[in-house]
Amino acid sequence: MCDSDIKVKQLEKRASGQAFELILSPPSMDAAPDLSITSPKKKECSLEEIQKKLEAAEERRKLHEAEILKQLAEKREHEKEVLQKAIEENNNFSKMAEEKLTTKMETIKENREAQIAAKLERLREKDKKVEEIRKGKECKEPSEK
């Protein structure tokens, strides 16, 4: 189309904008005729072709479903592995914590037994000294009388 084929007519002027009307002139016979776009003609499909297409579609659906099931199985397997690993780590942590606690309790028990033994030894020493002092006093008292 040329610029002469279009005419612009102003309709209204407003604060929000302007309105125009475009007038297109009829196409001239000199210009190349417009090629009308037509859709390709559909050919008749036979019953066999339709059946083949349906079978192919069914096969695609089955393959797609099998792929989805495979992905789900892989996802479940991964989840099982992750869960198993978490359980294993938890068990290892529990064992380590139990061993640590047992070691700590044994150390505390040994220290307590050592403290008790030391106190008993001090008490025996005091008892010896008291006994020596008592014997010493008993020996001195008869001579004083």
From Swiss-Prot:
Per the record, the major location class is cytoplasm
Function per UniProt: Involved in the regulation of the microtubule (MT) filament system by destabilizing microtubules. It prevents assembly and promotes disassembly of microtubules.
Which segments of the protein form a coiled coil according to its record?
40-135
Q: How does it assemble?
A: Binds to two alpha/beta-tubulin heterodimers.
Tissue localization of expression: Ubiquitous. Mostly abundant in brain and oocytes.
Q: What PANTHER family does this protein map onto?
A: STATHMIN
Q: Which residues carry this modification: Phosphoserine?
A: 16, 25, 39
Q: Which GO terms describe its molecular function?
A: tubulin binding
Write out the annotated subcellular location.
Cytoplasm, Cytoskeleton
User: Keywords for this entry?
Assistant: Coiled coil, Cytoplasm, Cytoskeleton, Microtubule, Phosphoprotein
What organism does the record attribute this protein to? Xenopus laevis (African clawed frog)
Q: Which SUPFAM superfamilies match?
A: Stathmin
Query: Known post-translational modifications?
Result: Different phosphorylated forms, from unphosphorylated to highly phosphorylated, are found in the mature egg. Progressive dephosphorylation from the mid-blastula to the tailbud stage.
Q: Which family does it belong to?
A: Belongs to the stathmin family.
Entry-linked InterPro entries: Stathmin_CS, Stathmin_fam, Stathmin_sf
Keyword GTP-binding found:
no
The protein here is known as Stathmin-1-A
